[in-house]
Design a protein with these regions (language model features):
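Extracytoplasmic
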Residues: 1-212
Length: 212
């Protein structure tokens, strides 16, 4: 949007400030399927360490006696969310990235940089105050749907920004670099709508010129 205004205007300067100081302007979000096969990690415990065996026993117990949130925070899900988050954060046209990984890393920094176990995460999820959980965790996970949401903003003031190419790059590299199979990550948000509108406008102009 910023390119529609002259650099001397207040709105341009304001949007540039948001871009440079507050992490970007145009929102984009990625919905990632984090479902996994039941007991995938615990299918064969014969060669596992005692610690891993205890983890599998805890998971089995939580599935038997608890709610879905008790066993949702598995290493597979957390690693997948972190991988997508880190990939998006590495892109030069991307500003602020927010996801469950953001919260996890704040917690890990307080926990002597140690990752939490699934059991610890389940306990934290239950014991954290409701208002904090609703504002800082719930927007980024859908337990019943086995989905994680990664929210980000694009740096609109980047001189070489190519929105269509960026969207294509993200869709492609989520599969080739991050390892998310096609169909398990959905890209949406205002940037997608804006890009679609521009592409429709360009196509309409081409057709109009061709008709003339």
């Amino acid at each position: 949007f910023i390119n529609y205004f002259r650099e001397s205007t207040e709105i341009y300067q304001g949007m540039k400030l948001i871009d440079e100081q507050l992490g970007g302007t145009t929102p984009l979000e990625i919905l990632v399927d984090v479902s996994e096969e039941d007991d995938e990690e615990c299918a064969d415990t014969s060669n596992m360490s005692e610690e891993d065996k205890e983890y599998c026993e805890d998971v089995a117990l939580m599935k038997e006696e608890g709610s879905p949130t008790d066993y949702w925070f598995t290493p597979y899900k957390m690693d997948r969310i972190k991988a997508v988050h880190d990939y998006l954060e590495s892109l030069p046209d991307v500003g602020k990235v927010l996801s469950l990984a953001s919260i996890l890393r704040v917690g890990e920094s307080i926990n002597d940089n140690k990752e939490f176990t699934p059991f610890e995460l389940a306990i934290l999820y239950k014991r954290i105050p409701t208002d904090i959980r609703m504002s800082m965790i719930e927007p980024y996970i859908a337990v019943d749907d086995n989905e994680a949401r990664i929210a980000l903003r694009i740096l609109d003031s980047q001189p070489d920004l190519r929105r269509k190419a960026l969207l294509e790059q993200i869709r492609s590299e989520l599969e080739t670099k991050v390892g998310i199979p096609a169909g398990e990550a959905k890209v949406s948000g205002i940037l997608v709508l804006y890009n679609n509108m521009l592409q429709s406008l360009f196509q309409s102009q081409i057709q109009t010129v061709g008709a003339v």
